[in-house]
C-alpha cells in the first residue's frame, strides 16, 4: 500500500460540493477584497458550513460520505481508515524508520495542544541529547512530501521573501486535513465544534484549518517565533507590496488581544504595516493596521491578492529606430 499525495477540497470547494452557488462565494470574495463585512444571514450560513467543514474535512471520500448520509459516524469511520493507512505506510523504509515516522505522525495532535507547538526532537524517541533535527530530516520530508503533514517553518527576523530567513530546524507540523484532527480530538462528539462548548479550546483546530487553506492557495507556510516578542501564528509573503503579511488566528471571544502581534507590528526593522486577525466575528474593521476578518475569509487569502491579471502582462519592447 502506498499513499499518493492527497489533494483535499479546500473550504471554497467544500461549499460548492455542499450546494453553495459560485455567485454567493464570489460576492463574499468581493467583500474580502474590499475589506467589507458580509450580511448577517450569509455570515451565519458560512460560519455553520465552516464548522461542518471542521468535522468533515476535505478528503474526497469523507466529503462524499457526508453528502450521501449526513452521518458523522460513517464519516469518522472513513477518517479512521485513513489514519490507519497513514500509520502502516512508508513501506520503502526499514522497520525502525517506519516506527519513527509513525511516532512523529502520532505526536502532531498533542504538539498542537502545547503552548509552543513546534516539534521537539528529544520527544520523538525519548533520547535527550542523542539526536538532532537533521537525524530525522528524511522522516519529516516523507510526511510533508507525501502530503500527510504540513510543515510551517519558524522565522525570527522576517524579511521578504520569507524563504530567505526561515529556520530549517524549527518547524510546526499540522495534519493535512482538519477532519482527521477533529476525529482524533473529539471523535463523535460533534457538539464540541457545532455548539461552541465553553470548556473546549478550538485554537489548534482553527490554526490547522487556516494552515490547510493557506497551503491550498499556494502560500508558503511560516510562523513568527522570537524570544523577546513572542509568537505569531502565520507569516506569508505579500507579493503585491513585496512585504510580509502576519496572520493571527483566534477561536475565542478575546480576538482583539494579541500582544505578540502588536509587538511584531511595532518593530521598525520589520517594515510591516498591516496584519490580519481571523475570528468568528462578522464585522470587518481595521484598527492600527490590523484588519479583523471572519475566519471563513481564510479561503480568499493569497499572497497575490491585489495583483490583477492586467498587472502580469508584459508589453512588447519596441525596436528602436536607427
Predicted regions and their residues:
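Active-site-adjacent loop/helix micro-motif of nuclease/hydrolase catalytic cores
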Residues: 253-263
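Nucleic-acid nuclease catalytic cores
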Residues: 226, 270-290
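Accessory nucleic acid-recognition modules appended to NTPase machines
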Residues: 63-239
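Active-site ExK catalytic segment of metal-dependent nucleases
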Residues: 244-253
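Short glycine-/polar-rich loops that comprise or flank the Walker A/P-loop
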Residues: 1-2, 219, 271-274
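Domain-level recognition of nuclease-like catalytic cores that cleave nucleotide substrates
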Residues: 281-322
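Conserved nucleotide-binding/hydrolysis micro-motifs of P-loop NTPases
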Residues: 8-13, 156, 180-181, 254, ...
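Interdomain motor-coupling "hinge/lid" segment immediately C-terminal to the ATP-binding subdomain
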Residues: 1-113
